Structures are given as structure tokens and as C-alpha cells.
């Protein structure tokens, strides 16, 4: 689950992590009230920041520095309500429905801090880099040595000596080391207490008077742990999420919309990724990732079908099922029911193997509907790509 920057900063502030003074605003009037208050309290400028669930806001024109109240009003009018396009939103962009108005900081250095799970090491890793303000993936690709890492032993947690090592690696001044250690320990505690899956401070800044701030931050939470955090669950902003993904989550379906025209319905995340790969290998483009899981019932299959066909870009559907816990006949009943109910106009290609596969194939054959069956994954992928092209 993603949250907004202002929400992440509110959480971090409770753990003693220094963040700039600021408040969220939902209207122009609220934005100006915050800006007036900050200027009255001695701010030399304010930053007007679009609040959307995407990175690259600055490059897209969603972050502006205002040195006067007039400039703040100009930028707030410009950004609030705009369709902000970044490298993470896609060409359609995301509508800005709220702003964060913050006091500017006298930046001396821009650094990076982050905590994430390293699956290869089976441990959390606390990362730091002197290349702040840049995408960390870009830094890792160009110069992996620029990222310093401290692996966290789950038995003892993140230790102060590790924080000191990272602080020295960042080249912080001796007078800043103790504050940096407290800063990092606060980040780690926030990460653990909230069942986060990602925590990034980018940039983590030092100021000309040797203070440390989280100038921008991002926190994602583990969806599977949200039953323990009702307060955090309330921070979810459904308006920032894809409507089809929101609909899928209601039925415990793992759905992610993509940019292609071949819809995929698969059981199992690994097979789903392999299915997307083989579609591309055959010359097509997947329209989504959809894992219906091993315990899907007929009703979930029907809902999955409705969601797939709600995407206007879909020209064909590829159903790739290896029946184990999810029996093939159960899937077949769901597919036939959905196809009849929705009066499906696009070609449907199936590759079926596993438990009750013969019963499933018979259900499809007896339905009288024009399903296309592939003998293998490769055969089915080639058929669905051809069908999407109208061949």
C-alpha cells in the first residue's frame, strides 16, 4: 500500500525524524493559509509540492519553489488540479488533488537513505548514498559502489554502530554524526513498527547550519500486514490507484494494469510472469498481470473476466492455467459463465493442464462458444498474438 509524502512525513515525525515545517492543502485557500503562516513564522520561501503516488514530480513540473506569497499563489493555482505526467504515471498522467506547502531549506548536501528487503540475502538492507536527489536504480546501474549497505540481522535489528558506519560513509561532518545516528535509528523503528516494505528518504539533506532533514520521503506498506494497522489502512487514497486494480482487490485478485492489448488470466505469480514473457516473445504485449491464485472459485473467475474486459485496449484474452488447487473444471465453469454473461466479443485463447483437465476441456467444448485452445504455452501464445492482430 502506498501513501502520500505528507502522510509519510507525519509518521516519521512521530519517530523523531526531522522534516521541514509544512501542511497539506486540498484547496487554493488552504494552500495560501499555510503559505501565509510559514512566511509569518520566518520562512524565507515555501515549496509547493504536488501530492500524487508517483516519483519524478519535480521534472514533471509538480514541485515549485516560491520566494514570495504571490509566487506561492501562482504555483498553487498552476499545480492544483493539473494532470501531472511523470515517468511513473504513464502518458495519461495523474490529477493533482492536494498540495504539500513546506518551508524551504538552506541545502548544503543532498544524500540518500533507504530501507528495503534484499530477497537474495533474506535480510533487510539499510542503504545510503552520496548521490541524493537521483533515482537510486539509476545510481545502482551506473555506479554500484556509490551505494553503501548495512545488512540487518533480524535477531538483533539495526545497530547504532551500523548507523555510524553509514554516516561516515556519507562523509558527514563530525558534528553531524550523532544526529545522523538518531535519524537512521528513527527510520528503522518507523519501518519495523509499521510493517513497511519500502522506506526512502531522497533527498536526505544537510543544511548550511549542519541540520539534517528528510526533504522528501516515500513509504510503502505490506498489504498482508494491514490487518494489524487499522490506523495506517485509513491512509489509503483509492483515488490515486487504478480503478481496475481497486476493483480486483475487492475479490482478492492480484491485478496490475499494463499497456498492451492481450489480457492474461493465470493461476500463480510465477506462471503469470512467464506468460507475459512468452506473449512478448511471440510478438505481443500483455495488457495486465492477473494471478487468480490457487483457491479461486467460479465467482472470482467471473469477476476476473469482467475486470479484464473492462480494459478498452484488450483485443484478445489468454487464459493459462495449470490446475492444482484450482481445478481446471472450476475455471472452465467460471470462464463459460463469464463469457455468456458478458457477451464477449474478443477471441479467448486457453492453455489448460492439471487437475480435471479433461472435464474442463469438455465443459468448454459443450458450451458452444468459440474458444481457441493451445496445445502448449508457446502454441497458445502464438495463437493469442495472431488473434489480437485479427489474423
Curated annotation (Swiss-Prot):
GO terms for molecular function: ATP binding; magnesium ion binding; succinate-CoA ligase (ADP-forming) activity; succinate-CoA ligase (GDP-forming) activity. It comes from the Bacteria. Pathway: Carbohydrate metabolism; tricarboxylic acid cycle; succinate from succinyl-CoA (ligase route): step 1/1. GO terms for biological process: succinyl-CoA metabolic process; tricarboxylic acid cycle. It catalyses: succinate + ATP + CoA = succinyl-CoA + ADP + phosphate; GTP + succinate + CoA = succinyl-CoA + GDP + phosphate. Residues 9-247 form the ATP-grasp domain. GO terms for cellular component: cytosol; succinate-CoA ligase complex. It holds the Pfam family ATP-grasp_2. Substrate binds at residues 267, 324-326. Coiled coil: none annotated. The keyword NAD does not apply. ATP binds at residues 49, 56-58, 102, 105, 110. Heterotetramer of two alpha and two beta subunits. Succinyl-CoA synthetase functions in the citric acid cycle (TCA), coupling the hydrolysis of succinyl-CoA to the synthesis of either ATP or GTP and thus represents the only step of substrate-level phosphorylation in the TCA. The beta subunit provides nucleotide specificity of the enzyme and binds the substrate succinate, while the binding sites for coenzyme A and phosphate are found in the alpha subunit. This is Succinate--CoA ligase [ADP-forming] subunit beta. It comes from Acidobacterium capsulatum (strain ATCC 51196 / DSM 11244 / BCRC 80197 / JCM 7670 / NBRC 15755 / NCIMB 13165 / 161).
Amino acid at each position: 500500500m502506498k501513501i502520500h509524502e505528507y502522510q509519510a512525513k507525519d509518521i516519521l515525525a512521530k519517530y523523531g525524524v526531522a522534516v521541514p515545517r509544512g501542511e497539506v492543502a486540498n484547496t487554493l485557500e488552504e494552500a495560501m493559509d499555510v503559505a501565509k503562516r510559514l512566511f509569518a513564522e520566518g520562512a524565507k520561501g515555501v515549496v509547493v509540492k504536488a501530492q500524487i503516488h508517483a516519483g519524478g514530480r519535480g521534472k514533471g513540473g509538480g514541485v515549485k519553489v516560491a520566494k514570495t506569497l504571490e509566487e506561492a499563489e501562482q504555483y498553487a493555482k498552476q499545480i492544483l488540479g493539473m494532470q501531472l505526467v511523470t515517468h511513473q504515471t504513464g502518458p495519461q498522467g495523474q490529477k493533482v488533488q492536494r498540495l504539500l506547502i513546506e518551508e524551504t531549506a538552506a541545502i548544503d548536501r543532498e544524500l540518500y537513505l533507504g530501507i528495503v528487503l534484499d530477497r537474495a540475502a533474506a535480510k533487510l538492507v539499510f542503504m545510503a548514498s552520496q548521490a541524493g536527489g537521483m533515482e537510486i536504480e539509476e545510481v545502482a546501474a551506473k555506479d554500484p559502489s556509490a551505494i553503501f549497505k548495512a545488512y540487518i540481522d533480524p535477531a538483533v535489528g539495526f545497530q547504532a554502530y551500523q548507523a555510524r558506519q553509514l554516516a561516515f560513509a556519507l562523509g558527514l561532518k563530525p558534528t553531524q554524526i550523532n544526529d545522523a545516528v538518531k535519524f537512521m535509528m528513527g527510520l528503522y523503528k518507523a519501518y519495523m513498527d509499521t510493517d513497511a516494505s519500502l522506506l526512502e528518504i531522497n533527498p536526505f539533506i544537510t543544511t548550511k547550519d549542519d541540520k539534517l532533514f528528510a526533504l522528501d520521503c516515500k513509504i510503502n506498506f505490506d498489504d498482508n500486514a494491514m490487518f494489524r494497522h487499522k490506523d495506517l489502512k485509513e491512509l489509503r487514497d483509492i483515488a490515486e490507484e487504478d480503478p481496475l486494480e481497486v476493483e480486483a482487490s475487492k475479490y482478492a485478485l492480484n491485478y496490475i494494469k499494463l499497456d498492451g492489448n492481450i489480457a492474461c488470466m493465470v493461476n500463480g505469480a510465477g506462471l503469470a510472469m512467464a506468460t507475459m514473457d512468452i506473449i512478448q516473445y511471440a510478438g505481443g504485449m500483455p495488457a495486465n498481470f492477473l494471478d487468480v491464485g490457487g483457491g479461486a472459485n467460479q465467482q472470482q473467475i467471473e469477476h476476473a473476466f469482467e475486470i479484464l474486459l473492462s480494459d478498452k485496449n484488450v483485443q484478445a484474452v489468454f487464459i493459462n492455467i495449470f490446475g492444482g488447487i484450482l481445478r481446471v473444471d472450476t475455471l472452465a465453469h467460471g470462464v463459460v459463465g463469464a463469457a455468456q454473461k458478458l457477451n464477449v466479443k474478443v477471441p479467448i485463447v486457453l492453455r489448460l493442464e492439471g487437475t480435471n483437465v479433461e472435464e474442463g476441456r469438455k465443459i468448454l467444448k459443450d458450451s458452444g462458444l468459440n474458444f481457441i485452445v493451445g496445445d502448449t504455452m508457446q502454441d497458445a501464445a502464438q495463437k493469442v498474438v495472431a488473434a489480437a492482430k485479427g489474423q
